[in-house]
């Protein structure tokens, strides 16, 4: 199966590419909100490290992966209303702690900045690691 260029990934996800620093980004609708897909560096013409089957599977299994990630977050943060957190990020090729990809949830503004919780997944779409807290 061939690798898709970033603009082809955006078409597959019915999204729109945009610049976000050193990352390639694409915004698309998911669950009535905006989901940002992003991957590290390169250019939109350079194929991502994943093939078309990966992207199609990711799109098809996203609702199930979202449920798995929320369960991890519920266990890690038992006092929080995880169901209310919007899934806003799907990050790929970030670094090893983020697995092959990670789902990111926007918890809102804090005194230190906007806080996101990321849940990493491996090549087999299995959970792989602890949640990651990231301030932006």
Q: Across the structure, where does each feature detected by a protein language model lie?
A:
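Acidic, proline/glycine-rich low-complexity IDRs
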Residues: 1-17, 94-136
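N-terminal leader/targeting segments
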Residues: 1-33, 37-41
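A diffuse structural propensity rather than consistent per-protein peaks
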Residues: 5, 47-48, 83-86
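Generic N-terminal initiation segments characterized by hydrophobic and/or small/turn-forming residues
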Residues: 9, 21, 30-34, 70, ...
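N-terminal trafficking/processing presequences and adjacent post-cleavage segments
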Residues: 25-77
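Amphipathic protein-protein interaction modules
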Residues: 56-115
